[in-house]
Amino acid sequence: MMYLTYYFIEITIFLAILCTIFIISAKNPMVSILYMIALFVIAAMYLYLIGLGIFSLLYIMIYIGAIAVLFLFIITLLDINSTELSVKSNIRDLPLVLISLIVLTISGLMIYSNDSILINKLLEAFGNDYNTIITQDWFNIENTTLLTTIGNVLLTNNAFILLVLAIVLLLGIIGPISITMKHKE
């Protein structure tokens, strides 16, 4: 059963990369938005498969429910016939996307490797708070509320994923603003 989960994780990673390429190479902005929604669903499936069910639900609610609807609203305001983009202009950005993907992959591997010098230096600089995690009374259920439990899980075990989601949300906010800005020519 465990191998089947790893197999599905590999499939979701491959589908996410494929959807990203389709987003970049789509000629019509509406088709690009549909691929982006598919990418959000695939990312939510990936988060569920690695054991982060609450993050997958939050990802679907925030990104598909809010950001994608906002993008669809902005794109419906644009004149689709005049905004048809050539595939060459989108493919031109592919090296930048690949470089960004490589940098994010290397940084993720550095963070999750046990013998990373960078992470050890950061822990020394900001203080090693593993003692507070270990000394926390995790089995005292009577005094723990749901908000406290979610806060402990978000800010201790999954802080990196929370930061990545915040950066993606920031990019999702900046995107519609840059689309609707009128450039002086």
UniProtKB/Swiss-Prot annotation:
Its EC number is 7.1.1.2. Belongs to the complex I subunit 6 family. Its main location: mitochondrion. The chain crosses the membrane at residues 4-24, 33-53, 54-74, 94-114, 159-179. One of its GO terms (molecular function) is NADH dehydrogenase (ubiquinone) activity. Core subunit of the mitochondrial membrane respiratory chain NADH dehydrogenase (Complex I) that is believed to belong to the minimal assembly required for catalysis. Complex I functions in the transfer of electrons from NADH to the respiratory chain. The immediate electron acceptor for the enzyme is believed to be ubiquinone. PANTHER family: NADH-UBIQUINONE OXIDOREDUCTASE CHAIN 6. It comes from the Eukaryota. It is found in: Mitochondrion membrane. Gene3D superfamilies: NADH-ubiquinone/plastoquinone oxidoreductase chain 6, subunit NuoJ (1.20.120.1200). This is NADH-ubiquinone oxidoreductase chain 6. It is a multi-pass membrane protein.
